[in-house]
Amino acid sequence: MVAETVAIAVWAMLPAYVPNNVAVLAGGGRPIDGGRTLDKLTDEDGVLYDENRILGDGKTWRGTAFGTAAGVVLALLLNQLQPFVAGTVGVPQFPIAAAVALAFGAMLGDILASFLKRRTGRQRGAAFPGVDQLDFVIVSLALTAIVATGWFLATFTLPVLVAIFVLTPVLHVSTNGLAYAFGLKDEPW
């Protein structure tokens, strides 16, 4: 039962796990924020925003597009494998809406985390514990729940969600450590 729950959790999240890794490999190009900063805006209590970049150089259109495409393609490939695996473990097929939501949601979560990092004065690559490990999970799940509600409810049962929120930080730290060891990242987180 536990092994099947873990297998379903990993299978269902693979289209969300892969995009940020592919974005690192395919990155470069024009930053999403175009190099812009938030000018100082104030309200009656003082400074609301700072002059840091909106997102930073690490969030590019190319990385976002390639990452999203990779997640969707992976979901379509998993759909081809699913009939062979489903007899052993009850893994789901991915409707296209779920595939896109998982992949793009992962990218969007990472983009939102970058925005939060800049607002809290963290530089590109700086650690942001908790947010770094779960940003993409929360947004990809939320977006999937909105655009593929029936599939989401059938797939992401409470035990599967628990497995995702326990396993993801471990997988995230492990894969980032490997990417750092191979020189693909400047930081091990």
Swiss-Prot record:
Taxonomy of the source species: Archaea, Methanobacteriati, Methanobacteriota, Stenosarchaea group, Halobacteria
Enzyme class: transferase
Major localization listed first in the record, in broad terms: membrane
Pfam families attached to this UniProt entry: CarS-like (PF01864)
Protein name as annotated: CDP-archaeol synthase
Transmembrane segments: 6-26, 71-91, 96-116, 125-145, 162-184
Alphabetical GO biological process terms: glycerophospholipid biosynthetic process
Keyword rRNA processing among record annotations: no
UniProt keyword Membrane present: yes
GO molecular function: CDP-2,3-bis-(O-geranylgeranyl)-sn-glycerol synthase activity
Entry GO terms, CC: plasma membrane
Catalytic activity annotation: 2,3-bis-O-(geranylgeranyl)-sn-glycerol 1-phosphate + CTP + H(+) = CDP-2,3-bis-O-(geranylgeranyl)-sn-glycerol + diphosphate
Cofactors (names): Mg(2+)
